[in-house]
């Protein structure tokens, strides 16, 4: 429109790539300063939430700018640090999802933090912002080093977050276990990155892909070849990233950390870092290592990891009586489902990537709704056993019916968004030649009915002497927003499917 100044005219295009990161960083600094001067800490929660929402709005406004859209379509998206950070459709989508996760966690945790973290009230939100910033760098990076830096910012902040209940033995144990295993996984990942650099002579993903496609000083000059160094580098990368998403066989940390960490922290871990790590896997393996004959090799390994994660996660979840441990193993199984799309992206890249993006979004909004209820139950009476949910349909009908819908979605029963997500994963796997993996995914979905049904049966059929729950505005709002998200993604799925397909097609 005449007279309307576009976003790209106001801001240097190179800064557009990190504008949401700058807003989150500024929010973090503002909260730290205000924390030192304000005695009323609870009001600062809304400052934190406002900064995250502002960062989300900046993504929407930037992504809708015609000049930026034209640049992305022409293969010239806004870049920063010489192309190490990039603002393409994939970046916009994943940053929007991650900021949405952070916003919901901030909202659901307000009462819990006020009750249990009086001595570290604002530290909790400051660390949430730091983790969010690290995740955003992970998904925005087109360089192995910046991906690793983002991952380490995420990981180190997460270790602190897991142990933020300083006087709680389980929280301290969770932090220690997470730190020891996470530091080892980070070292393995860094070693893998160094081997990839040694093979290709670059840490920039486009240059890595070009070197592998055309030969380098280590890869045979006659063409691409699987050298021992390259195989070792890919293997170490898979182990490191597999740990971050809690994929079998490097999943053992997840149940203990999920159980011991504060419930809002567990909610954050189950959706945020997992989604960011999945996006980083796509960046590295599709954007850097997505060159024949390498794709079919790493795709098969991810397919095997997906199969193991689905099966182990669901089978062990059947045996759990602690609902946080049950959801930890459910999260491992969900990671397996998402890895089906990662495996499919090796041969059907656009459809595979699109299915991963859609499922990450659907899983995040569903899982956060579940953990919002779990958070209220924990803060109300330390109720973390499945039996503690007896009679919840009478104690709080909203929570009981919301959990029922969320469980139905995670199982993948039509017509929920969970069914749509699994259908897209199934279709991508079948199109890539992994029909056996698609069938195994369907079988595992049936297995998962067992442990979800146990909770539903306790909520609706068992009698209880537990009192009614004290109202919590933040948690109730989170449950309602999650319900709205699940319903909206189910009824109005087509725009979101198109959005994920466009983001997948523009992955650089």
Curated annotation (Swiss-Prot):
Q: Name one GO cellular component term.
A: plasma membrane
User: So what EC number does this one have?
Assistant: 7.1.1.-
Record flagged with keyword Transmembrane helix: yes
Give the GO terms filed under biological process for this record: ATP synthesis coupled electron transport
Cellular location(s): Cell membrane
Q: What family is this protein classified in?
A: Belongs to the complex I subunit 2 family.
Protein name, please? NADH-quinone oxidoreductase subunit N 2
Source organism of the structure: Symbiobacterium thermophilum (strain DSM 24528 / JCM 14929 / IAM 14863 / T)
Source taxonomy: Bacteria, Bacillati, Bacillota, Clostridia, Eubacteriales
């Amino acid at each position: 429109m005449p007279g309307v100044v576009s976003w790209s005219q106001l801001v240097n295009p190179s800064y557009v790539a990190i504008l949401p990161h700058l807003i989150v960083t500024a929010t973090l600094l503002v909260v730290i300063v205000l924390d030192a001067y304000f005695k009323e800490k609870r009001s600062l929660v809304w400052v934190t939430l406002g900064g995250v929402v502002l960062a989300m709005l900046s993504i929407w406004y930037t992504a809708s700018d015609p000049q930026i859209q034209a640049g992305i379509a022409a293969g010239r998206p806004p870049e920063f640090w010489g192309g190490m950070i990039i603002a393409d459709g994939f970046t916009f989508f994943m940053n929007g999802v991650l900021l949405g996760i952070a916003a919901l966690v901030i909202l659901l945790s307000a009462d819990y933090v006020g009750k249990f973290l009086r001595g570290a009230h604002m530290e909790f939100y400051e660390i949430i912002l730091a983790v969010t910033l690290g995740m955003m760098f992970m998904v925005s990076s087109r360089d192995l080093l910046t991906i690793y830096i983002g991952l380490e910012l995420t990981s180190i902040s997460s270790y602190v977050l897991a142990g933020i209940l300083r006087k709680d033995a389980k929280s301290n144990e969770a932090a220690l276990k997470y730190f020891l295993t996470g530091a080892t996984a980070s070292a393995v990942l860094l070693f893998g990155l160094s081997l990839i650099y040694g093979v290709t002579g670059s840490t920039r993903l486009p240059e890595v892909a070009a070197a592998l496609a055309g030969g380098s000083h280590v890869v045979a000059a006659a063409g691409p070849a699987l050298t021992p160094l390259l195989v070792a580098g890919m293997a170490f990368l898979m182990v490191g990233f597999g740990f971050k998403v809690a994929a079998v066989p490097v999943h053992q940390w997840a149940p203990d950390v999920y159980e011991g960490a504060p419930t809002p922290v567990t909610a954050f871990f189950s959706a945020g870092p997992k989604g960011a790590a999945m996006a980083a896997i796509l960046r590295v393996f599709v954007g850097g290592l997505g060159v024949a004959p390498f794709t079919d090799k790493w795709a098969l390994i991810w397919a095997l990891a997906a199969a193991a994660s689905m099966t182990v996660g669901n089978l062990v979840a059947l045996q759990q009586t602690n609902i946080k441990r049950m959801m930890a193993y459910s999260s491992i199984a969900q990671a397996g489902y998402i890895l089906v799309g990662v495996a499919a992206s090796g041969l059907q890249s656009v459809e595979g990537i699109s299915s991963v993006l859609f499922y990450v979004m659907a899983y995040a909004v569903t899982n956060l709704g579940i953990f919002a209820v779990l958070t209220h139950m924990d803060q109300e009476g330390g109720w973390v056993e499945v039996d503690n949910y007896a009679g919840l349909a009478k104690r709080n009908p909203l929570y009981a019916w919301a959990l029922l819908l969320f469980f139905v979605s995670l199982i993948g029963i039509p017509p929920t968004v969970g069914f749509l997500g699994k259908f897209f994963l199934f279709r991508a796997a079948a199109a890539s030649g992994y029909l056996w993996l698609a069938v195994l995914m369907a079988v595992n979905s049936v297995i998962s009915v067992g442990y979800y049904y146990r909770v539903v049966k306790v909520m609706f059929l068992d009698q209880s002497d537990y009192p009614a729950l004290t109202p919590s505005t933040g948690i109730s709002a989170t449950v309602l927003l999650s319900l709205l998200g699940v319903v909206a993604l189910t009824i109005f799925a087509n725009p979101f499917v198109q959005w994920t397909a466009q983001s997948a097609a523009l992955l650089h």
